[in-house]
């Protein structure tokens, strides 16, 4: 490797990989998934040298194991069970499950295929590797880091001056961070700020940094959870994906770990399944696409229609936020519901250069295509347009006929 090792701990992933991973381990061990990388930036190109470095970094990641100290940390999290910790004691990433080539318009193609239990753990470290390799090799990294520090100092100053009202907010920037160094710098700096009354820094999705700085590791479920539990079983009608996902989650966690993601197959379809039982059991819902104000008003109206006081529930916003957008959302919703924010790239990769818009998504489960139909065009990723059409027709039929 030409660069220092980027991923140095198996805790260096997002918290929801463990919350989903435990449920996969207990309920879906036979499921197999395929994951596909995509760079959405049109003007980005990965050189052959970058691709080779990415391969070597992924190989280094695959040599890691959980330490006993890390396992003890996980075991002390309320909802993590000893059986899952014992599995993690034996678990290791498998480089054999990766295919990394230059066969893509951006110059980088990555696929991972294997059990869902394994491959779910690859997404976040791989994206962090790709991002850091790109910015270290395409730019003068020292210049970028100076820009990052300057902007971070300004954020800290404005936080201290009570410029923003961020309610309960967390850092969600691991997958698109400038570097491990930059993310750690940002999390540490924000954690040390004496925030005013309307802002509370809760923690980070990066479990490694949460452990290091004694912060709360934050995260529940991702789109893959709804896609695979709902669409990975060929006997399921995919328009009911949310029901299967919520049902399995509640069986695993009861009232714990309860922020539901709404936009995997549109929020309107989600609400058909998010009825009194689930709306009561889950502590809140997460917004990740579409107009956040329309979404929040829709969720509040839904809670009211069920006789649930929305002020007892959390609206967690996590779509392309910065501190100004979060403040505006807080001001609008603060008297209507609990409000929380997950803020990623703005904290972990804010420089003078455009951040990468990269994803690694589940494209198959158990040999069957899976897809996300979010609340805004352009966020979906499926290799088979016929399946997307089928899924849309299933959703449309349900919305028209399942009253």
Regions found by a protein language model. Give the residues of each.
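Ordered alpha/beta subdomains of enzyme catalytic regions
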Residues: 1-241, 359-403
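Glycine-rich phosphate/ribose-binding loops and adjacent secondary-structure elements
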Residues: 2-3, 213-403
């Amino acid at each position: 490797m030409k660069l220092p090792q980027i991923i140095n701990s198996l805790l260096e992933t997002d918290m929801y990989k463990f919350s989903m991973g435990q449920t996969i381990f207990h309920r879906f061990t036979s499921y197999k998934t395929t994951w596909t990388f995509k760079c959405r930036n049109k003007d980005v190109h990965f050189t052959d040298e970058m691709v080779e470095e990415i391969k070597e970094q992924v190989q280094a990641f695959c040599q890691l194991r959980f330490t006993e100290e890390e396992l003890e940390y996980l075991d002390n999290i309320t909802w993590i069970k000893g059986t899952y910790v014992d599995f993690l004691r034996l678990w290791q990433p498998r480089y054999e499950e990766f295919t990394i080539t230059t066969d893509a318009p951006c110059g980088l193609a990555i696929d991972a295929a294997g059990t869902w239990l394994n491959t779910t753990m690859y997404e976040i470290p791989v994206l962090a590797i790709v991002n850091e390799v790109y910015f270290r090799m395409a730019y003068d990294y020292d210049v970028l880091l100076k820009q990052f520090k300057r902007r971070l100092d300004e954020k800290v100053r404005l936080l201290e001056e009570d410029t923003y009202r961020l309610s309960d907010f967390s850092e969600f920037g691991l997958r698109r961070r400038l570097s491990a160094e930059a993310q750690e710098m940002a999390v540490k700096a924000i954690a040390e700020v004496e925030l005013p009354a309307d802002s509370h820094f809760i923690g980070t999705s990066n479990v490694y940094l949460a452990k290091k700085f004694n912060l709360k590791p934050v995260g529940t479920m991702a789109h893959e959870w709804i896609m695979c539990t709902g669409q990975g079983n060929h006997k399921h009608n995919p328009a009911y994906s949310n029901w299967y996902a919520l049902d399995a989650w509640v069986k695993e966690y009861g009232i714990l770990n309860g922020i539901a993601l709404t936009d995997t197959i549109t929020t309107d379809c989600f609400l058909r399944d998010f009825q009194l039982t689930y709306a009561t059991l889950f502590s809140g819902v997460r917004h990740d696409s579409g107009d956040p104000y329309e979404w929040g008003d829709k969720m509040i109206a839904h809670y009211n229609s069920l006789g649930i006081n929305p002020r007892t529930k959390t609206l967690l916003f996590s779509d392309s936020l910065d501190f100004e957008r979060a403040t505006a959302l807080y001001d609008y919703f603060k008297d209507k519901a609990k409000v929380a924010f997950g803020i990623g790239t703005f904290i972990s990769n804010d420089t003078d250069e455009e951040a990468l818009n990269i994803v690694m998504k589940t494209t198959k489960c158990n040999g069957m295509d899976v897809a996300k139909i979010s609340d805004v065009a352009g966020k979906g990723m499926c290799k088979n347009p016929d399946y997307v059409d089928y899924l849309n027709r299933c959703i449309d039929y349900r919305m028209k006929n399942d009253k």
